[in-house]
Amino acid sequence: IDVDSEEFETKVDNYKNSLLIFEYQQRLIDQNFDTSVSTNDIINYYNTHIKEFKLEQDIFKGRLIIVDKDAPNLSELIKLFKSNDDSDIDEMISYCLLYAKEYYVNDSAWSYFNPVKSKIPNTMSARNIYYSNRKYDIVAQDNFIYLLFLKEYKFKGEISPFSIEKEKIKNLIINKNKMKYLQKLENVLIQNGRISNDINIYL
């Protein structure tokens, strides 16, 4: 291969300089860049760009219990499952710990529905359940009984709630702030004539 040695050395030097500058920037970021983002900043960003936050899949607040059809006291479990009383919910959780094959009972937090959908019979329709008066369905199939309650439900394409987007927005703001910081840093270094061999980095 015919390679111009001078051109090759120039490229190597440029590559080394790029690595040195990158390492220098990373160390300054580690030492000086503030990664904190206030909750107000996150809320303001969400409210300002709310139309951009569309759900890519269905989400829900609810409960799912999968239990063997031969599990004890199923009638009591169903009674507890339908209840919103705190003591009943605690009792339901205790039951699930002992007998449920799988369960999810945190109906105060949004969760993605796809993992649930993959575990329930095809006859259980989220749309039908959610728009029904009782908002739950109980289905026996094969060796198991499936109990599904949908307290709240949002479909793909709807506006995503703040709790789902909070961490994404925080990281987005951090990355934007980091880019601004790096641009400011680069401008200062250029002004000081320091983007050269003047920068001593001890690796």
Residue ranges, per PLM feature:
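Peptidyl-prolyl cis-trans isomerase
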Residues: 1-203
